[in-house]
Amino acid sequence: MTYETNTPTEESIIPKHEDGEEYNSIYLSRFEKDISISQTLDFSQFMQTQILLTAKRKALELGDDRSPINNDPYNIRRSDFDELSEYTASKSPSIISEASHNSPSRELDDSGDENTSKLTGTKQSMLKARNRQAAQKCRIKKKKYLQTLQDQVNYYTSENKELLQSANDLREEIIKLRTLVFAHRDCPVSKACSKALFLMGKEKPLTPP
């Protein structure tokens, strides 16, 4: 980092008057000019320079001849000022926080957060749409399955009724046949059949229906 300073010559130094006012006013303007900051300084160096300027003004207002700025203005250190640490602790954080709040990186973070929120919203919308489609397909599949089961129930119910009707018809047919056979039990043909069945071991007594 670079500083743009003008080193004073012996001719440019103004001796201090007894009251010190003329010396202080002229010397303050020269001091501010000598420590002018170029645009290439970073923020921390800028803050340090501003703190030194404030300390210089306060020292001149108090008229303290023992101020390190009055004694050796071109060899100033932080430890020479009692109020420097307090001023830094009270003023610098607010200025730094304000600068960081308005910094381009903060703007980039905000824009990144907005893009992230938009992307998250888009993903959520797509996820909800997929969930709706999946739920609709599941409902359609379940409806088809239930309809298939109902069709099977109807089919087997109808078939059962038909089989029951056929069983009843067959029972009636059996009763009719047994009635006819019993009516012809004294017929020679019936006797011959009974004898043949007896010889085969399958004869059964004829009973009325």
Swiss-Prot record:
Residues 163-177 are annotated as: Leucine-zipper. Keywords: DNA-binding, Nucleus, Transcription, Transcription regulation. Residues 123-161 are annotated as: Basic motif. Residues 90-103 have a biased composition (Polar residues). GO terms for biological process: regulation of transcription by RNA polymerase II. One of its GO terms (cellular component) is nucleus. Coiled coil: none annotated. Residues 121-184 form the bZIP domain. GO terms for molecular function: DNA-binding transcription factor activity, RNA polymerase II-specific; RNA polymerase II cis-regulatory region sequence-specific DNA binding. It is found in: Nucleus. Residues 90-133 are annotated as: Disordered. The keyword Chloroplast does not apply. It comes from the Eukaryota. InterPro entries: bZIP, bZIP_sf, bZIP_transcription_factors, Leuzip_Jun. Belongs to the bZIP family. This is Transcription factor atf31. It comes from Schizosaccharomyces pombe (strain 972 / ATCC 24843) (Fission yeast).
